[in-house]
Amino acid sequence: VIITDSGQDFAEVSRKLTGLLGRQKALPDWLYDGVILGIQEGTDVVDAKIKKAKEAGVPVVGVWCQDWSGCRRTGFGYQVMWNWEWDQELYPGLDKKIAEWKEEGVRFLGYINPFIAIEKDLYAYASEHGYCVQDREGKDYLVTITTFPAAMVDFTNPEAYEWYKGLIKENMIGLGMGGWMADFGEYLPIDAVLYSGEDPAIIHNQWPAI
Protein backbone atom coordinates (compact mmCIF):
# COMPACT_ATOMS: atom_id res chain seq x y z
CA VAL A 1 0.00 0.00 0.00
CA ILE A 2 1.38 3.40 -0.99
CA ILE A 3 -0.11 6.50 0.65
CA THR A 4 0.64 10.01 -0.60
CA ASP A 5 -0.33 13.37 0.88
CA SER A 6 0.93 16.93 1.03
CA GLY A 7 0.88 20.01 3.22
CA GLN A 8 1.47 23.76 3.11
CA ASP A 9 4.51 23.51 5.40
CA PHE A 10 6.57 21.02 7.38
CA ALA A 11 4.36 21.35 10.46
CA GLU A 12 1.27 20.34 8.50
CA VAL A 13 3.07 17.45 6.82
CA SER A 14 4.35 16.31 10.22
CA ARG A 15 0.83 16.43 11.69
CA LYS A 16 -0.51 14.32 8.85
CA LEU A 17 2.35 11.83 9.02
CA THR A 18 2.13 11.33 12.78
CA GLY A 19 -1.64 11.16 12.52
CA LEU A 20 -1.15 8.17 10.25
CA LEU A 21 1.80 6.47 11.93
CA GLY A 22 1.27 7.54 15.54
CA ARG A 23 2.60 10.43 17.61
CA GLN A 24 5.62 10.00 19.81
CA LYS A 25 5.05 10.72 23.48
CA ALA A 26 6.75 13.76 24.94
CA LEU A 27 10.29 13.09 26.09
CA PRO A 28 11.02 13.35 29.84
CA ASP A 29 12.23 16.71 31.12
CA TRP A 30 15.52 15.33 32.44
CA LEU A 31 16.61 14.54 28.89
CA TYR A 32 17.08 18.24 28.16
CA ASP A 33 19.34 18.93 31.13
CA GLY A 34 22.59 17.47 29.79
CA VAL A 35 24.21 14.78 27.68
CA ILE A 36 23.79 11.02 27.45
CA LEU A 37 27.13 9.26 27.10
CA GLY A 38 27.42 6.08 25.05
CA ILE A 39 29.74 3.82 27.05
CA GLN A 40 30.42 0.10 27.10
CA GLU A 41 32.78 -2.58 28.46
CA GLY A 42 31.57 -2.90 32.04
CA THR A 43 30.61 -1.31 35.34
CA ASP A 44 34.04 0.04 36.27
CA VAL A 45 34.59 1.61 32.84
CA VAL A 46 31.19 3.29 32.91
CA ASP A 47 31.64 4.58 36.46
CA ALA A 48 35.10 5.97 35.70
CA LYS A 49 33.93 7.78 32.57
CA ILE A 50 30.93 9.31 34.35
CA LYS A 51 33.26 10.69 37.02
CA LYS A 52 35.76 11.96 34.46
CA ALA A 53 33.04 13.74 32.48
CA LYS A 54 31.61 15.37 35.59
CA GLU A 55 35.06 16.48 36.74
CA ALA A 56 35.43 18.19 33.35
CA GLY A 57 32.16 20.05 33.92
CA VAL A 58 30.04 17.99 31.55
CA PRO A 59 26.37 17.83 32.67
CA VAL A 60 25.75 14.08 32.38
CA VAL A 61 22.10 12.99 32.65
CA GLY A 62 22.42 9.47 31.30
CA VAL A 63 24.63 6.65 30.11
CA TRP A 64 23.66 4.35 27.26
CA CYS A 65 25.29 0.95 27.64
CA GLN A 66 24.26 -1.30 24.77
CA ASP A 67 26.33 -4.23 26.06
CA TRP A 68 24.48 -4.56 29.39
CA SER A 69 23.45 -8.06 28.22
CA GLY A 70 27.02 -9.08 27.38
CA CYS A 71 29.31 -8.94 24.39
CA ARG A 72 30.84 -11.08 21.70
CA ARG A 73 34.02 -10.41 19.75
CA THR A 74 33.80 -11.23 16.07
CA GLY A 75 35.61 -10.38 12.86
CA PHE A 76 33.28 -7.38 12.74
CA GLY A 77 34.52 -6.15 16.12
CA TYR A 78 33.01 -5.75 19.60
CA GLN A 79 29.32 -6.64 19.41
CA VAL A 80 26.41 -7.03 21.80
CA MET A 81 25.33 -10.47 23.01
CA TRP A 82 21.63 -10.55 22.17
CA ASN A 83 20.57 -12.32 25.33
CA TRP A 84 18.27 -9.91 27.11
CA GLU A 85 19.45 -10.51 30.64
CA TRP A 86 21.89 -8.54 32.77
CA ASP A 87 25.42 -9.89 32.23
CA GLN A 88 26.67 -9.94 35.81
CA GLU A 89 30.20 -10.87 34.79
CA LEU A 90 30.68 -7.84 32.54
CA TYR A 91 28.58 -5.55 34.76
CA PRO A 92 29.06 -6.70 38.37
CA GLY A 93 26.92 -4.83 40.89
CA LEU A 94 25.01 -3.06 38.14
CA ASP A 95 21.71 -3.06 40.01
CA LYS A 96 23.24 -1.10 42.89
CA LYS A 97 25.22 1.20 40.61
CA ILE A 98 22.10 2.09 38.60
CA ALA A 99 20.45 3.24 41.83
CA GLU A 100 23.56 5.21 42.84
CA TRP A 101 23.89 6.86 39.44
CA LYS A 102 20.22 7.83 39.48
CA GLU A 103 20.70 9.54 42.86
CA GLU A 104 23.44 11.55 41.15
CA GLY A 105 21.04 12.48 38.34
CA VAL A 106 22.39 9.95 35.83
CA ARG A 107 19.94 7.48 34.25
CA PHE A 108 21.06 4.12 32.89
CA LEU A 109 19.81 3.29 29.38
CA GLY A 110 20.08 -0.07 27.64
CA TYR A 111 19.51 -1.79 24.34
CA ILE A 112 17.26 -4.50 22.91
CA ASN A 113 16.19 -5.85 19.53
CA PRO A 114 13.86 -8.61 18.24
CA PHE A 115 16.68 -11.16 17.89
CA ILE A 116 17.96 -13.63 20.45
CA ALA A 117 21.40 -15.20 20.58
CA ILE A 118 21.19 -18.90 19.75
CA GLU A 119 24.03 -19.73 22.15
CA LYS A 120 22.09 -18.76 25.26
CA ASP A 121 19.26 -20.04 27.47
CA LEU A 122 16.68 -17.50 26.34
CA TYR A 123 16.85 -18.91 22.83
CA ALA A 124 16.56 -22.48 24.11
CA TYR A 125 13.37 -21.51 25.95
CA ALA A 126 11.94 -19.56 23.01
CA SER A 127 12.68 -22.34 20.54
CA GLU A 128 11.21 -25.02 22.77
CA HIS A 129 7.98 -23.04 23.13
CA GLY A 130 7.66 -22.17 19.44
CA TYR A 131 8.26 -18.46 19.95
CA CYS A 132 10.59 -17.92 16.97
CA VAL A 133 9.86 -16.88 13.41
CA GLN A 134 9.98 -20.01 11.24
CA ASP A 135 11.36 -20.82 7.81
CA ARG A 136 9.40 -22.73 5.17
CA GLU A 137 10.71 -26.03 6.50
CA GLY A 138 9.24 -25.37 9.93
CA LYS A 139 12.58 -24.60 11.57
CA ASP A 140 13.61 -21.48 13.44
CA TYR A 141 14.59 -18.90 10.83
CA LEU A 142 18.21 -17.98 11.60
CA VAL A 143 19.19 -14.62 10.15
CA THR A 144 22.88 -13.83 9.76
CA ILE A 145 23.67 -10.38 11.11
CA THR A 146 27.21 -9.25 10.27
CA THR A 147 29.05 -12.48 11.17
CA PHE A 148 26.69 -14.61 13.27
CA PRO A 149 23.22 -16.20 13.01
CA ALA A 150 20.38 -15.24 15.36
CA ALA A 151 16.74 -16.20 15.83
CA MET A 152 13.88 -13.71 15.80
CA VAL A 153 10.91 -13.59 18.19
CA ASP A 154 7.57 -13.99 16.39
CA PHE A 155 5.47 -11.11 17.69
CA THR A 156 2.37 -12.40 15.90
CA ASN A 157 2.33 -15.22 18.47
CA PRO A 158 0.51 -13.80 21.52
CA GLU A 159 2.46 -16.00 23.95
CA ALA A 160 5.78 -15.00 22.40
CA TYR A 161 4.74 -11.35 22.52
CA GLU A 162 3.93 -11.56 26.23
CA TRP A 163 7.14 -13.46 26.95
CA TYR A 164 9.26 -10.81 25.23
CA LYS A 165 7.29 -8.06 26.96
CA GLY A 166 8.02 -9.80 30.25
CA LEU A 167 11.75 -9.73 29.51
CA ILE A 168 11.56 -5.96 29.11
CA LYS A 169 9.54 -5.50 32.29
CA GLU A 170 11.61 -7.80 34.47
CA ASN A 171 15.13 -7.58 33.07
CA MET A 172 15.23 -3.94 31.98
CA ILE A 173 12.62 -1.87 33.81
CA GLY A 174 13.00 -4.12 36.85
CA LEU A 175 16.75 -3.53 36.83
CA GLY A 176 16.13 0.20 36.98
CA MET A 177 16.71 1.29 33.40
CA GLY A 178 15.46 4.74 32.48
CA GLY A 179 15.00 3.77 28.83
CA TRP A 180 16.54 1.82 25.99
CA MET A 181 17.24 1.75 22.27
CA ALA A 182 14.86 -0.54 20.36
CA ASP A 183 16.79 -1.64 17.29
CA PHE A 184 16.47 -3.75 14.13
CA GLY A 185 12.73 -3.60 13.48
CA GLU A 186 13.44 -3.78 9.75
CA TYR A 187 14.89 -7.28 9.49
CA LEU A 188 11.80 -9.51 9.16
CA PRO A 189 12.56 -11.88 6.23
CA ILE A 190 9.86 -11.75 3.57
CA ASP A 191 10.11 -15.51 2.99
CA ALA A 192 9.50 -16.35 6.65
CA VAL A 193 6.49 -18.18 8.10
CA LEU A 194 4.64 -16.39 10.90
CA TYR A 195 2.47 -17.83 13.66
CA SER A 196 -0.48 -15.70 12.53
CA GLY A 197 -0.24 -16.93 8.95
CA GLU A 198 0.11 -13.35 7.70
CA ASP A 199 2.26 -12.62 4.68
CA PRO A 200 5.62 -11.31 5.98
CA ALA A 201 6.00 -9.19 2.85
CA ILE A 202 2.82 -7.35 3.85
CA ILE A 203 3.51 -7.12 7.58
CA HIS A 204 7.20 -6.27 7.13
CA ASN A 205 6.79 -2.50 7.49
CA GLN A 206 4.39 -2.91 10.41
CA TRP A 207 6.89 -5.03 12.35
CA PRO A 208 8.59 -2.17 14.25
CA ALA A 209 5.24 -1.00 15.61
CA ILE A 210 3.94 -4.37 16.80
State what each model feature region is.
Residues 1-210:
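Catalytic-domain carbohydrate-binding cleft regions of carbohydrate-active enzymes
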